[in-house]
A protein has these predicted regions:
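Conserved residues at the C-terminal ends of beta-strands
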Residues: 69, 104, 156, 223, ...
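Conserved alpha-helical substructure of the radical SAM core
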Residues: 2-152, 357
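Residue-level signal for well-ordered alpha-helical positions
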Residues: 69, 168, 223, 311, ...
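Radical SAM enzyme [4Fe-4S]-AdoMet core and its adjacent flexible, acidic
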Residues: 1-16, 26, 147-152, 156-291, ...
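Accessory C-terminal segments flanking Radical SAM cores
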Residues: 3, 48-52, 218, 228, ...
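Generic structural signal for helix capping and beta-alpha/helix-loop junctions
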Residues: 73, 110, 138, 162, ...
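Radical SAM enzyme core and accessory elements
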Residues: 1-45, 304, 313-316, 324-393
Length: 393
């Protein structure tokens, strides 16, 4: 499918909101959470959860390390959720204490109802976020989504120069679109983040900060390379770009840490999480079990809910999702950054919840164990490290 064909189905609903029951001319404010509400959420359920919602498996890009690539994906398997399904998901997510909803794909901007989904989430008090390759940005859809309550944008970056990035993505002039998107969203206070796949396309990590700044990014996060996923999610590849030996991958994490500390450029991945992934590679005991299935979730275009991208079997269909389905078993099977990194950051909030519940049950020794767990300090340090980014999401 050509870029022109994708443009025809990108975010462009009728101006009057026909067919969605919404008036798109009326702006929706970005959701905000008061400190008092946040404290209550932490005590009650460990703080707001996070849902990655793959609203489509269609993508306009042709990345060399992704199963969603347009040249690899079977057109007969294309599937997108309906607007009504998305609204149902958002209602269910609210009941399950989700505070952040990240729309992913495929490429979420190909979905014609993305605006309506973002608006509905924002009205329900969930912070809507978009993860995109940036190839379908237009002045029209940027302005539209900003007025729909969009909270944050994540855009993919693969290399430290334009030619290498655009060649891998198969998207001509995408860097110019990304630069313009950063300029536009930052002018409105909508946070943008570069999501960098740690692949062999990156020849020199020290060149990344200047390149990111040239595109208008003020921070970045690294996606750890994935060569196999057990769920329906296809953002992985067995190919050479993301295929590393354990020793090579260990050194990749060293390079990320060195870049982070030498340059001072804001890297969202907590240092402790990078250390944790190195412990994982060495087969050492890991300090922070993953909160996937308890605070973080992946939902696919079939509405099957997984604890993360890696897991083989769904927890349940989204319509069956309730507290009884939650899993908290300290899993350390994988190295997926969007579950492992926040598990370090949110550890202290979940510890506060555990302490509070133990106190209410009169279990004072158990409460004390949670309070004096050394990992609380490590988690607090990670939050302090990412404080500016966390408060803007």
């Amino acid at each position: 499918m050509s870029d022109a064909a994708f443009d025809s189905v990108s975010v462009n609903p009728p101006a009057n909101g026909a067919g969605s029951g919404d008036d798109f001319s009326v702006p929706v404010p970005r959701p905000k959470t008061s400190i008092f509400k946040l404290v209550g959420e932490v005590l009650d359920h460990g703080g707001p959860g996070y849902l990655q919602f793959a609203i489509t498996n269609i993508c306009n890009a042709d990345c060399g390390f992704c199963g969603f690539a347009r040249s690899q994906f079977d057109p007969k398997k294309r599937r997108s959720v309906t607007l009504q399904e998305a609204k149902d998901v958002i209602d269910i997510a609210v009941r399950n204490h989700i505070g952040y909803l990240l729309f992913v794909g495929g490429e979420p901007l190909v979905h014609r109802d993305l605006r309506a989904m973002v608006r509905y989430a924002a009205r329900k008090g969930i912070k809507p976020m978009i993860c995109t390759n940036g190839g379908l940005w237009t002045e029209e859809n940027m302005k539209a989504l900003a007025s729909d309550g969009l909270s944050s944008v994540i855009m993919s970056i693969d290399a430290h120069d334009i030619a290498a990035h655009e060649k891998n993505r198969g998207l001509k002039d995408v860097c110019a679109k990304i630069r313009r998107a950063n300029e536009f969203f930052l002018s409105l206070g909508v946070q943008t983040t570069a999501s960098i796949t740690a692949s062999k396309l990156i020849e020199d990590y020290d060149k990344l900060p200047a390149f990111l700044e040239s595109l208008g990014f003020e921070n970045c996060t690294f996606s750890y390379p994935l060569t196999d996923l057990k769920s329906s999610y296809l953002s992985f590849s067995e190919g050479g770009l993301v295929s590393f030996t354990k020793d090579e991958l260990y050194e990749v994490f060293e390079k990320i840490k060195r870049m982070k500390h030498r340059s001072g450029y804001p890297v969202v991945n907590p240092t402790e999480s990078l250390d944790e992934m190195q412990r994982h590679l060495r087969g050492e005991t890991e300090q922070f079990g993953c909160l996937g299935g308890f605070k973080y979730f992946y939902l696919d275009w079939h509405l099957n809910l997984y604890r993360c991208h890696f897991w083989e079997t769904p927890m349940c269909n989204v319509y069956e999702w309730d507290e009884s389905k939650l899993v908290r078993d300290g899993c350390t099977r994988c190295m997926i950054d969007c579950y492992r990194d926040p598990s370090v950051l949110q550890f202290v909030a979940v510890s506060v919840m555990d302490t509070w519940k133990a106190l209410k049950q009169g279990q004072f020794l158990r409460a004390a164990r949670h309070v004096f767990d050394r990992r609380n300090l490590t988690s607090i340090k990670a939050v302090a490290e990412d404080f500016k980014w966390v408060t803007k999401v």
